[in-house]
Amino acid sequence: MKLKFCGLNSIESLIHARELGADFAGLIFTDESPRKVGEAFLSKLPSFNFGETIPVCVFVNPSVLMVSNMIEMLPNSILQFHGEETDDFCRQFHHPFWKSIAVKDHDSYLLSANFPSAQAILFETHSINLHGGTGQSFDWRMLEGIDANNKFILAGGINQSNIKAAISMNPWC
């Protein structure tokens, strides 16, 4: 199983994630998030040694220019889309991407079929006000029936009291 730390917005947190062996480091590029990366941090990213940790650029309904700029800055990154992006929009960059699906009922996971080009699907808690980053878990039983051969990522509210249950869902990450 892979491990992703998300919402990293300082060089110190990136170093810590790398030292702990995180497979992925999530960097938030949306204004609605309090964990959005700042300009000073962004200016340091091109020279940062990620080691084995892969940066993940997290977007909500971004412009083509914004995504293209991040690919240029971090060519070894993965794109993660959290808005109303379509599969066509996401794959136009010819770059690996993950698509987030907000789980609100037992049929939510079926939406993953709309993203055949995604490298993985990230399932997280549905929120009326936010596109992720709630820190809340959802009832993971709503994913029963998901094809375990597909790469899926379980996100949101995973902590010491529910980590065993999260692992038992057999997520890729």
Spans of features found by a protein language model:
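Conserved N-terminal beta1-alpha1 strand-loop-helix module at the mouth
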Residues: 1-173
